[in-house]
Amino acid sequence: MAKIVDIKGREVLDSRGNPTVEADVLLDNGIIGSACAPSGASTGSREALELRDGDKSRYLGKGVLKAVANINGPIRDLLLGKDPSDQKALDRAMIELDGTENKAKLGANAILAVSLAAAKAAAQDQDLPLYAHIANLNGTPGQYSMPVPMMNIINGGEHADNNVDIQEFMVQPVGAKTFSDGLRMGTEIFHHLKAVLKARGLNTAVGDEGGFAPNLASNEDALGAIAEAVEKAGYKLGTDVTLALDCAASEFYEDGKYNLSGEGKSFDAEGFADYLKGLTERFPIISIEDGLDESDWAGWKILTDKIGEKVQLVGDDLFVTNTKILKEGIEKGIGNSILIKFNQIGSLTETLEAIQMAKAAGYTAVISHRSGETEDSTIADLAVGTAAGQIKTGSLCRSDRVSKYNQLLRIEEQLGAKAVYRGRAEFRG
């Protein structure tokens, strides 16, 4: 049985040019597992703490040398000699060493990087693909599926410097037969969308997640442009391709009002729920993420009651990959899906627990990147290894996004006939 003989942390850059944490876990047989922690822009208030230095003389205060020092010091000392395959023991030990509710002492970025690096080392040690090792850790050995990609092809909100309030407009190739076919469909739509925007005299620069970020008259205008691109690509909207939104509503919620500054409109919770309901009636939108503010549970209940039978309502800032919060949401009938982000909770073990709790309650689980990413493609293996069925990892450009899609293509090839792609069956309604 291999043992951990060294752990190394370092400061690297993410896709926004901000520092993040990378960790190496070295085993006594020479195997090395490496992983990076991602970082978000629109974040939930109850996420685990991303430890940054606050030293304005380095990286505008965003350095992560404190987190790196925690890896190279106390975390390393704690885990030396441990079995890398006992993921739960490693993660629990780090959580106990931290001793805070939100990992504020060691930093969720430090704990997560080591947690994922250990999983990668353990997978290599057992001569397993990472997705297979994750399935074993999840208690579902050999149960895999290829996720439906939710491809963010127009960026707004905190992910772009434009006037569009809703943060993400996504296409889902639900009519594809395989993941690779779905990826091709999304890519073709992406290129046609560029032509549609150019023909309208609009900017085709991209946002943080690789989607186009033009100024548009309204959120409905963005959906209309995508609908035109789908048609020009030769696909049928609502059958071959469906739509999804990430409102990130907490970013435009203030004093009990949802303020769409790009449209000059303001709503109370019921009014905004009706606004979203109207969009789902005019377009084949089958998933809405963070449709209401994370603290507006009454509003979430209104939205769930209005459209929850037909539309996947995903809690991101709402649930922050946290089983305590998710449990409360399930009990109160809030939403019907959870977004899964490693760094919101800070360890692989806790991430798997959130997925398991969601599935047991009949909620869907959507595996997700962050807007600040690296070349690390672990979420691709997580999606397949947990058979989550859905993945959000951005648009069809920027290597920090495409690296995840390319890993999924490799996994699909490895699985061969076992590479199940369920398409529309992964969604509600």
Swiss-Prot record:
EC numbers, comma separated: 4.2.1.11
Q: Give the subcellular location.
A: Cytoplasm; Secreted; Cell surface
The record's annotation in InterPro entries points to: Enolase, Enolase-like_C_sf, Enolase-like_N, Enolase_C, Enolase_CS, Enolase_N
The record's top EC class is lyase
Name the catalysed reactions. (2R)-2-phosphoglycerate = phosphoenolpyruvate + H2O
Q: Which domain of life is it from?
A: Bacteria
**Main subcellular location:** cytoplasm
Instruction: Kindly list the positions annotated as binding (2R)-2-phosphoglycerate.
Output: 167, 341, 370-371, 392
Keyword set, alphabetical order: Cytoplasm, Glycolysis, Lyase, Magnesium, Metal-binding, Secreted
**Cofactor binding, per record:** Binds a second Mg(2+) ion via substrate during catalysis.
State what this protein does. Answer: Catalyzes the reversible conversion of 2-phosphoglycerate (2-PG) into phosphoenolpyruvate (PEP). It is essential for the degradation of carbohydrates via glycolysis.
What subunit structure does UniProt give?
Component of the RNA degradosome, a multiprotein complex involved in RNA processing and mRNA degradation.
Name it: Enolase
Report the source organism. Pseudomonas putida (strain ATCC 47054 / DSM 6125 / CFBP 8728 / NCIMB 11950 / KT2440)
